[in-house]
A protein has these predicted regions:
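Short helical segment in ABC ATPase nucleotide-binding domains corresponding to the A-loop/adjacent helical element
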Residues: 48, 101-110, 120, 141
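ABC ATPase NBD Q-loop/coupling interface
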Residues: 66-81, 141, 232
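Conserved ABC ATPase "signature" region
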Residues: 71, 117-137
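Conserved ABC ATPase signature
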Residues: 142-147, 151
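Catalytic Walker B motif of ABC-type/P-loop ATPase nucleotide-binding domains
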Residues: 168-171
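ABC ATPase "signature
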Residues: 226-227
């Protein structure tokens, strides 16, 4: 029995007539961090958005092939339930224009989960999980938009955790952060993979090498190579992968 929580089979995606993803096939292991790397425009963020159907919001999209979460086709899952199970954190922190506490209980309210006491306990537990409880426990009524960029991003991750996802999608979560804040978010990812499965899109190859267990290199809509991160970075099997990670292009 395998431990794959997410699989793609012959996945293709078109923006109008533009073929953005081409026959993508790979498996994601449970409780792992999988990094998607490649030059701008290669399709890695488009692929990430497929996994919780965020691309459905874009006009003139056409897809073929299959995506499975726990062997269930995502098209057969209620989209609200899918986005509860497969949560996403975006490139720039996007807290809601509420208080810190309002952000933390928003998902619970939307999904009708828990009474007032349970919501408060869940908010505390998830803030603790991302290392923010001590910093924010006396600031729960503070507008979330007043926080620093790093704290906003960690708050967005904590907010996602309240609805107990299985898979966390991170689309360049550190691109707006300084090196110290980036290090903290990377440490958080390493802690979270004990309980969750994480996919991250990153332009930072050093970050991919530091935090991920598996790496996929994408180029012009193709998944050129996928494997264990140590193998991808030390002995890639495709010369295009080697060219990218050694800086010959990208």
């Amino acid at each position: 029995m395998n431990d794959f929580v997410l699989k793609t089979r012959d996945l293709n995606l078109y923006y109008g007539t533009f073929h953005a993803l081409k026959n993508i096939n790979f498996n994601v292991h449970k409780n792992s961090i999988t990094a998607l790397i490649g030059p701008s425009g290669c399709g890695k963020s488009t692929l990430l958005r497929c996994f919780n159907r965020m691309n459905d919001l874009i006009d003139d999209i056409r897809m073929s092939g299959d995506i499975f979460v726990h062997d269930q086709r995502i098209e057969d899952v209620d989209i609200i339930e899918l986005r509860k199970k497969v949560g996403m954190v975006f490139q720039r922190p996007n807290p809601f224009p509420f208080t810190v506490y309002g952000n933390m209980v928003y998902g619970l309210k939307i999904h009708g989960l828990g009474n007032k006491k349970k919501k408060r306990n869940m908010a505390e537990n998830c803030l603790r999980a991302v290392g923010l409880w001590e910093e924010l426990k006396d600031k729960l009524s503070t507008p979330a938009l007043d926080l620093s960029e790093e704290i906003k991003q960690r708050l967005c991750i904590a907010r996602l955790l309240t609805v107990e996802p299985e898979i966390i999608l991170l689309d360049e979560p550190c691109s707006a952060l300084d090196p110290i804040a980036t290090m903290r978010v990377e440490e958080l990812m390493m802690e979270l993979k004990q309980k969750y499965t994480i996919l991250i899109v990153t332009h930072n190859m050093q970050q991919a090498a530091r935090v991920s267990d598996y790496t996929g290199f994408m180029l012009l809509g193709d998944l050129v190579e996928f494997g264990e991160t140590s193998q991808i970075f030390t002995s890639p099997s495709d010369e295009r992968t080697e060219g990218y990670i050694t800086g010959r292009f990208g």
